[in-house]
From Swiss-Prot:
Keywords on record: Acetylation, Calcium, Metal-binding, Motor protein, Muscle protein, Myosin, Phosphoprotein, Repeat
Note: This chain binds calcium.
Assembly and binders: Myosin is a hexamer of 2 heavy chains and 4 light chains.
Tissue: Predominantly expressed in adult atrial muscle.
Protein's recorded name: Myosin regulatory light chain 2, atrial isoform
Record-listed N-acetylalanine modification sites: 2
One Pfam family this sequence matches: EF-hand_5
GO molecular function: calcium ion binding
Positions bearing Phosphoserine: 22-23
Length: 175
């Protein structure tokens, strides 16, 4: 009987600790940020079951143009959640990753996902398509307004390193 009680108390304490940990993650972000994370989670959760699984990741990568992602890479991503990745776990993982992260490096990392060759540029037309079809869909006018301020290389690709500098430091470069 005593051992059953201790086991029950241990479960209750673990549940309380998990609730406390998950409630803290929501206080790390503003409501608008949480909504953006929710939209990102919904984009990744392809089968809409509330849990990100390997097939969700494969489909998301496929939509981003990366068809053959190594199984080990997908497994490593899923293992970061130490269990099923629901929205709270997803938010916690981002909270851990972004805590103390340089905003410029975070933006560069996001762009690198669209630059598998590591050239420092992303294809303008592919990026335009993503902006108009994923998450907070941009209108054609909004995309053109964005691209008017976006540095391009001679081939018409987006120079995302320069764009990142503009986003984090403003339009004027230091002399």
């Amino acid at each position: 009987m005593a051992s059953r009680k201790a086991g029950t108390r241990g479960k209750a304490a673990a549940t309380k600790q998990a609730q406390r940990g998950s409630s803290n993650v929501f206080s790390m972000f503003e409501q608008a940020q949480i909504q953006e994370f929710k939209e990102a989670f919904s984009c990744i959760d392809q089968n809409r079951d509330g849990i990100i699984c390997k097939s969700d990741l494969k489909e998301t990568y496929s939509q981003l143009g990366r068809v053959s992602v190594p199984e080990e890479e997908l497994d490593a991503m899923l293992q970061e959640g130490k269990g099923p990745i629901n929205f709270t776990v997803f938010l916690t993982l981002f909270g851990e990753k972004l805590n103390g992260t340089d905003p410029e490096e975070a933006i560069l990392s996001a762009f690198r996902m669209f630059d598998p060759s590591g050239q420092g540029v992303v294809n303008k037309e592919e990026f335009k398509q993503l902006l108009m079809t994923q998450a907070d869909k941009f209108s054609p006018a909004e995309v053109e307004q964005l691209f008017a301020l976006t540095p391009m290389d001679l081939a018409g690709n987006i120079d995302y390193k320069s764009l990142c500098y503009i986003i984090t430091h403003g339009d004027e470069k230091e002399e």
